[in-house]
């Protein structure tokens, strides 16, 4: 998944190198509300910042899109399919790993796994305060969003083919998020990079190639 800027997406995912050097065909789907699919002024606006139910719908649409895409790839007789997602895409990759049983590998890059926790951490007192004054606390939001949580589904990808990477200095997705996914997945391979919310570190790029 990427934000909708093709050049940026190719660079973030190292797509040209993976294709030319390793012979991997790379597909970059665009998240709902992102890039050419945006509904507001900015890419991503509305995915988390709109109605609470809209986030459920956006996640459900994301998984539907991915499964349709996987069906198309399989119809072309692809020998194997792996999924690599970054940030919110990492969340969706982790969720897909618990829904689709035909993936060869999954890599969750700098993934948040609890969107309610993420919102309560970063939304600020004005947004959080307005929700709480309306009688909506973090636990209620977490319960609503649990239907699209990667922590609510058991992974179907083989243990050795699950991997996570995260940044020890990530101030957007704090370490407790990837650590919770690591525990939920049975403690598979995890790489802690010497950086922040950045999928382009040497450690992350090496992990992708090795998987």
Where are these regions (language model features)?
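Active-site signature of alpha/beta-hydrolase-fold catalytic machinery across serine-
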Residues: 13, 95-99, 180
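Short, surface-exposed "cap/lid" segments of acyl-processing enzymes
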Residues: 1-41
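The feature captures the conserved acid-bearing segment of alpha/beta-hydrolase catalytic domains
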Residues: 118-183
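Hydrolase active-site cap/lid region
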Residues: 94-140, 192
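Alpha/beta-hydrolase fold nucleophile elbow
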Residues: 74-87
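Conserved alpha/beta-hydrolase "nucleophile elbow" surrounding the catalytic nucleophile
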Residues: 85-90, 167
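Alpha/beta-hydrolase active-site loop
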Residues: 42-76
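Histidine-bearing beta->alpha loop at or near hydrolase active sites
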Residues: 179, 189-201, 205-206
């Amino acid at each position: 998944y990427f934000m909708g800027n093709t050049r940026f997406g190719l660079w973030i995912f190292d797509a040209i190198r993976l294709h030319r050097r390793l012979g991997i065909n790379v597909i970059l789907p665009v998240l709902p509300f992102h890039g050419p699919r945006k509904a507001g002024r900015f890419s991503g606006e509305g995915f988390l910042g709109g109605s609470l139910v809209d986030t459920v719908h956006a996640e459900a649409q994301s998984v539907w899109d991915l499964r349709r895409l996987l069906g198309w790839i399989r119809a072309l007789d692809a020998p194997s399919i792996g999924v690599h997602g970054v940030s919110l895409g990492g969340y969706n990759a982790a969720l897909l790993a618990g829904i689709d049983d035909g993936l060869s590998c999954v890599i969750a890059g700098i993934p948040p796994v609890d969107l309610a926790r993420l919102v309560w951490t970063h939304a600020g007192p004005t947004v959080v305060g307005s929700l709480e004054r309306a009688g909506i606390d973090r636990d209620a939001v977490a319960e609503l969003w649990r239907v699209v949580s990667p922590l609510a589904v058991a992974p179907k990808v083989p243990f050795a083919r699950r991997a996570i990477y995260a940044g020890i200095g990530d101030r957007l997705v704090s370490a407790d998020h990837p650590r919770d996914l690591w525990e939920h997945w049975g403690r598979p391979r995890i790489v802690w990079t010497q950086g922040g919310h950045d999928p382009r570190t040497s450690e992350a790029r090496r992990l992708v190639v090795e998987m």
